[in-house]
Amino acid sequence: MRHIICHGGVITEEMAASLLDQLIEEVLADNLPPPSHFEPPTLHELYDLDVTAPEDPNEEAVSQIFPDSVMLAVQEGIDLLTFPPAPGSPEPPHLSRQPEQPEQRALGPVSMPNLVPEVIDLTCHEAGFPPSDDEDEEGEEFVLDYVEHPGHGCRSCHYHRRNTGDPDIMCSLCYMRTCGMFVYSPVSEPEPEPEPEPEPARPTRRPKLVPAILRRPTSPVSRECNSSTDSCDSGPSNTPPEIHPVVPLCPIKPVAVRVGGRRQAVECIEDLLNESGQPLDLSCKRPRP
């Protein structure tokens, strides 16, 4: 490599160009790759993937039984040359060769040997994990039982006792039957038959009102005796009553009552125990004062 001495510490353009040419020729001449078109990197170039798998110990044996050439020939339908098997070579375990015909022993282009399928035992005889108790419990389903005596011989109670470990526990149905809570008779009482509705009464004609004759009473007594007939009007008569000029004090007047289905308001629980002729009102409303 040449050494260039610079006088004054100044490098001219010609000197710099010669230095670059010398560097390219002597250093990068052999290792410089040829220019090529830029291509985007592939997925395998971006990620460092380890595609080398561990060797399979059975790969060589399988390749000898089913070589790639034989598989390709079978797919393409190409006839192969049959040669007698080597002495001591085992036959495939899952295929059996039929006895060769005399005319097939000669060398030449012949068809593939006829293979007969055999039944293969695919059952796994390896000892696995023993079945756990959880699998047996999941397989058993809960069954609601109804027995004559609650808590005795009930499958529902036995299911809960086995799962919880409590020998005195009972299922919900036996508990309610024992305590008498919210248990009704198995057969409901027959509902009363609805009474036939009475036929609507026919409208009756109102009697005609006879206009009353206002007469001035002769005496304060309402009853009068007739002197000509010597009879006294003690009973009811067909004539309307007489109107007196004197009005009695504090007469009893009828009060209109509105018929309703509401019950009387309840202030405390004791009101429910008191016998009352009217039905009780269990609503939240209170009567106005």
From Swiss-Prot:
Q: Where is this region: Interaction with RB1 in competition with E2F1?
A: 41-49
Motif PXLXP motif, interaction with host ZMYND11, residue range(s) on this chain? 113-117
**Region spans: Interaction with UBE2I:** 76-140
Its recorded name reads Early E1A protein
Question: Single GO cellular component annotation?
Answer: host cell nucleus
Positions carrying Phosphoserine: S89, S219, S231
Effect the entry attributes to changing T178P: No effect on ATF7-mediated transcriptional activation
Q: Which family does it belong to?
A: Belongs to the adenoviridae E1A protein family.
* Position of sequence motif Bipartite nuclear localization signal: 258-289
Q: Altering S185R: what's the impact?
A: Abolishes ATF7-mediated transcriptional activation
Q: What does this protein do?
A: Plays a role in viral genome replication by driving entry of quiescent cells into the cell cycle. Stimulation of progression from G1 to S phase allows the virus to efficiently use the cellular DNA replicating machinery to achieve viral genome replication. E1A protein has both transforming and trans-activating activities. Induces the disassembly of the E2F1 transcription factor from RB1 by direct competition for the same binding site on RB1, with subsequent transcriptional activation of E2F1-regulated S-phase genes and of the E2 region of the adenoviral genome.
Residue ranges annotated as compositionally biased, kind Polar residues, are: 219-237
